[in-house]
Amino acid sequence: MKKILLIGLLVYFASQVNAQEYLFEFGTIRGLDALVTSESPEEVPIKWFDVNTGKDTWYFEGDDLVCKGLPIGVIRSEKQYQNFIMHIEWKHMEAGGNSGTFVWSSAVPGENRLPDGVEVQMLELDWVNQNKKDGVLPPIAYVHGELFGVGGVETIPDNPRGTRSKSIENRCLGKGEWNTYVVVCVDGVIKLSVNGKFVNGISQSTQRKGYICLESEGAPIHFRNLRITELPFGVVTDEQIAPLLN
């Protein structure tokens, strides 16, 4: 019985990977030279592929990429990234909304429909009020840019809350307001700037090259001004690289 269940799960996960199809372009990639020369940077659009959401989950309002929030799942970048700087702006449209991005991900969904990698959390401020346990509020740091490994990816938190790393300053804005994240990823180390200040980080990630994913997790969210600046490669082992997808 266990063998049959295992085979069924493998078939399911394989079907999720094979179902990935091109959706749209959103955001741009540029090289490091763009930061150190006076020339206008050559920017290449980023192509996105559906992993397990659906074409109707995502649409554009002007320059904003809007995610409806259902079904739960992710879309992924066309290519993998190792060392890079990611600038992304986001705003929730509902109180307590939940979303995020995954970096260094395999983009293969697990049983909870989400992939492995390091998650860069994006929660609306009222989330803590809506998720009390026995009348006790979760730590406010939940909603100000947590970082944590998921799906078997391990990290060392700069500011530990268990295995997660919490923000050391409350800087996120509430629903309807734009937040700016700058995520610097280099050789297994991630530093997160929230609205103009670095307030969180992790190190020694066991996965250091993979896809970038945008998350659909139950609530509408807007994204805009996604820019990725690629940095020079570092030394990684095969075990630290997510498998390539077709």
Regions found by a protein language model. Give the residues of each.
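Carbohydrate-interacting regions of secretory-pathway proteins
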Residues: 20-246
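Sec-dependent N-terminal signal peptides
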Residues: 4-13
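Sec/Tat signal peptide C-region and signal peptidase I cleavage site
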Residues: 13-19
